[in-house]
Amino acid sequence: MEKKPLTPRQIVDRLDQYIVGQQNAKKAVAVALRNRYRRSLLDEKLKDEVVPKNILMMGPTGVGKTEIARRIAKLSGAPFIKIEATKFTEVGYVGRDVESMVRDLVETSVRLIKEEKMNEVKEQAEENANKRIVRLLVPGKKKQSGVKNPFEMFFGGSQPNGEDEAESQEEANIEEKRKRMAHQLALGELEDYYVTVEVEEQQPSMFDMLQGSGMEQMGMNMQDALSGLMPKKKKRRKMTVREARKVLTNEEASKLIDMDEVGQEAVQRAEESGIIFIDEIDKIAKNGGASSSADVSREGVQRDILPIVEGSTVVTKYGSVKTDHVLFIAAGAFHMAKPSDLIPELQGRFPIRVELNKLTVDDFVRILVEPDNALLKQYQALLQTEGISLEFSDEAIHKIAEVAYHVNQDTDNIGARRLHTILERLLEDLSFEAPDVTMEKITITPQYVEEKLGTIAKNKDLSQFIL
């Protein structure tokens, strides 16, 4: 049974569990996601005409641009990749070519589909793995290779019946032992026994060696050509039955799934639901004022990205991928440049513009306590492992938020990431002393926050280096 797609309101509610504020950005991505579902219900003729409305997010670092896109991808189960515009160079220069973003998207899609298919056959794979473990625990009798007397086959020589009977009896005994062992295995009595398993040796691929050189596609093609000629190396590893089950289940699951089918589905899902998040797009915009050779290079990257965003066909090892219906979300702080500094053709490909707000003191308070993975909850869980119950008074939380806000105002504004630095500084001594502390409950008060952070926060020079 297929999951019912989320409505825009439900998507925003889910995002609220992890990201504070930024309602305009959440609405924009929620509508973009829902439009994909709406498009899937159209007839084929009209479906091809409806293209996704790409989104341009503008706002300082640390306000939730990347997190919104990442959470959206998780909610929809869509292939998602985050790339940085500054990593690319225009065609003809050393560096990554822009088509590699589409190849990366397809690789992500393949991993997603493979994982889904492996989950579908997990039960059968685990059953096969358990059978292999039983055979490892009770090995069979080694077969005699070759014929002792080469003339036996010509003169009717064969093993005496007595030997045949003994061999049959031995096989029956082994089978009986295996049945008993399988029963014990099912009861979980053999989990800590050791077995020796043959596993494939992981070796660096040609693709890994050429990563970042702009020659990834050549590396993948060479790897595919050579993999059929060279057998995969195996090595013997001693491990517990518990570990062996995981390794063998993965091996058995891989045998049960059709990788050609996975590749085809992956290409289709990348084309229909893929999301590419292009970060730091403002860094390839032309800066206002006099032009320079750097501006020419930046413009070259923009012109290379343009056909991918417009819709083109990129050849990957799984087949040709059309980017016409891939959703592109671009983001940048736009401190030095403006969206209008991008080339007009690229601007036109991002019709939805969303400005994310700077974080206020109240936002910082909410970030500390509201999300499911809130920072304070993380620190409380970490210290709970040492037997310490850590509490924060409301006034202390407000004080931490104020310090974060003012340090951002006085130095560089790094958004919510400032809280990581401040909390590390605040709880540094406590984390160090935690194993030796006898108190079961510790409450952080505003006085403690002032003592640890007050002087540093007020001194601009110190703030720049420490917080």
UniProtKB/Swiss-Prot annotation:
Entry keyword Nucleotide-binding: yes
Modulation of this protein's activity: ATPase activity is much induced upon complex formation with ClpQ.
Binding sites annotated in the UniProt record for ATP: 20, 62-67, 279, 345, 417
Keywords, alphabetical: ATP-binding, Chaperone, Cytoplasm, Nucleotide-binding
Pfam families in the record: AAA, AAA_2, ClpB_D2-small
Transmembrane segments: none
GO terms for MF: ATP binding; ATP hydrolysis activity; peptidase activity; proteasome-activating activity
PANTHER family found in the cross-reference section: ATP-DEPENDENT CLP PROTEASE ATP-BINDING SUBUNIT CLPX-LIKE, MITOCHONDRIAL-RELATED (PTHR48102), ATP-DEPENDENT PROTEASE ATPASE SUBUNIT HSLU (PTHR48102:SF3)
Family membership noted in the UniProt record: Belongs to the ClpX chaperone family. HslU subfamily.
Role played: ATPase subunit of a proteasome-like degradation complex; this subunit has chaperone activity.
Protein name: ATP-dependent protease ATPase subunit ClpY
Organism (species): Bacillus subtilis (strain 168)
